[in-house]
């Protein structure tokens, strides 16, 4: 999927940003790294909210951003929020692609679906200023598009090249009004009062003539628009998010029979999910290590509990064994860690490391193929070596068909990525490495040898600077000592 954004938080303009299987966003503090992630979460919580009249849900459950003026670039009311999404064939559910509706078109497979939404705020009344959707098919030159533009008052001009956006009873009337142009229907210049359900047009009161009113009431209640909603809802429902401050470990957890419980923004339900699904089978990747230090991934199938233990214990080496044990007749349960001394201790007795990485591993393993996992600063409370190994785990999820978006400050994480690309165990074509500098998103070009063609200023070069400073200081002290000894000999 590609995303375009204008006038959202720190982003003034970002065009066709490619969310690759592994997207890594880094940069200085307060530089705008989180803005793109926040927009994705705003769209997600808007789609999942039952209040269809709300055009944009800015607060809860995934992110809270305040009022509309708070999310506008530089807080200027003249700046109108815009976002656009491009879904490619692999992003579109099979049920939509194989539907009778699109087979009826008989123009080939869906190549991509594009949606653009532009907002305007007038006297604290947020409304959709412009809406555009286009279905593009593999057959050369064949598209279906609908463009709505609000001009004055609540009236929208309607431009489309297909009657398929409308109800069946309206199609015949539409055919009588439009003109033929290169075998495509053109309907231009008609105006209507249009209502939106979230981002989707769903009804209209015609404003041109009484003749039209017979046909156009709720004319957007069509399959074409319902499929648009299905594509978006399917994609965003498969997004899970783990914020930078994950839940603190507890001595025990209350049992909950809710099998639909999600991971939580802080990973607060990771223990519950592990307890509920411990014996569930998962397909995941393991690592084969070579003496040279290179690795090779291979598929495996095991229980969730064993898969979690493989990564946290065998790879990260943060414990000998992790196990969920029920207590008080199953009313509560405890996550116990078998440590290097052979002692079984509650998870809250072993520091923050295990509890911080547990939600990442659990959610990563149970997420389905074609899902998206967003991680903000996953390296917090982790040893540098584990930060490096975390990249190996995250890339294993990519190989399982999952999409990962990571915002990170970890040079260990990115250095490990470059190493794995150079060694050939990670594919550079699956990676988008972005550095945010002065609120500008700069995609860094990685070569297949793990090198960067452009190295931004202050991009993880502090370690090199400090090492050079240490060597310089050591050399200076050594020279002073030699000079002192030389004078003493005299």
How should these model regions be labeled?
Residues 103-109, 151-192, 252, 268-275, ...:
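Contiguous hydrophobic segments
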Residues 1-90, 95-97, 297-487:
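Switch/communication elements of ASCE P-loop NTPase nucleotide-binding domains
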Residues 23, 46, 139, 143, ...:
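Residue-identity detector for threonine
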């Amino acid at each position: 999927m590609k995303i375009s954004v204008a006038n959202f938080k720190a982003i003034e303009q970002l065009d066709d940003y490619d969310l690759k299987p592994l997207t890594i966003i880094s940069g200085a503090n307060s530089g705008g790294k989180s803005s793109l992630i926040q927009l994705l979460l705003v769209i997600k919580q808007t789609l999942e909210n039952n209040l269809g009249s709300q055009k944009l849900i800015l607060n809860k459950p995934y992110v809270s951003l305040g009022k509309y003026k708070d999310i506008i670039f530089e807080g200027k009311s003249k700046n109108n929020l815009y976002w656009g999404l491009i879904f490619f064939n692999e992003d579109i559910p099979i049920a939509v692609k194989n539907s009778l509706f699109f087979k009826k078109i008989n123009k080939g497979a869906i190549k991509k679906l594009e949606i653009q939404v532009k907002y305007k705020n007038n006297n604290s009344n947020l409304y959709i200023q412009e809406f555009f959707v286009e279905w593009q098919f593999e057959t050369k030159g064949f598209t279906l598009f609908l463009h709505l533009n609000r001009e004055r008052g609540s009236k929208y001009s309607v431009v489309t090249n297909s009657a398929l956006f409308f109800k069946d009873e309206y199609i015949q009337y539409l055919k009588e009004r439009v003109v033929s142009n290169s075998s495509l229907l053109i309907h231009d210049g008609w105006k209507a009062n249009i209502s939106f359900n979230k981002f989707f047009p769903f009804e209209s009161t015609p404003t041109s003539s009484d003749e039209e009113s017979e046909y156009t009431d709720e004319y957007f209640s069509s399959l074409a628009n319902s499929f648009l909603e299905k594509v978006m809802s399917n994609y965003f429902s498969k997004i899970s998010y783990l914020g930078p401050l994950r839940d603190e470990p507890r001595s025990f957890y209350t049992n909950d029979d809710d099998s639909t419980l999600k991971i939580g923004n802080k990973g607060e339900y990771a223990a519950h999910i592990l307890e509920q699904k411990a014996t569930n089978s998962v397909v995941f990747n393991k690592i084969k290590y070579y003496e040279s230090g290179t690795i090779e991934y291979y598929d495996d199938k095991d229980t969730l509990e064993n898969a979690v233990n493989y990564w946290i214990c065998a790879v990260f080496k943060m414990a000998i064994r992790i196990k969920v044990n029920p207590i008080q007749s199953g009313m509560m349960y405890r996550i116990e860690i078998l440590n290097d001394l052979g002692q079984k201790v509650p998870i809250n007795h072993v520091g923050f490391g295990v509890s911080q990485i547990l939600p990442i591993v659990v959610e990563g393993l149970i997420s389905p193929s074609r899902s998206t996992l967003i991680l903000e600063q996953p390296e917090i409370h982790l040893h540098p070596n584990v930060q490096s190994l975390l990249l190996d785990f995250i890339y294993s999820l990519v190989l399982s068909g999952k999409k990962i978006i990571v915002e990170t400050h970890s040079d260990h994480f990115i250095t490990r990525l470059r190493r794995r690309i150079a060694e050939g165990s990670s594919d550079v074509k699956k990676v988008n490495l972005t550095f945010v500098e002065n609120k500008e998103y700069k995609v860094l070009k990685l070569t297949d040898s793990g090198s960067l063609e452009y190295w931004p200023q202050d991009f993880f070069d502090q370690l090199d600077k400090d090492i050079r400073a240490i060597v310089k200081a050591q050399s200076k002290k050594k020279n002073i000592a030699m000079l002192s000894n030389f004078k003493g000999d005299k």
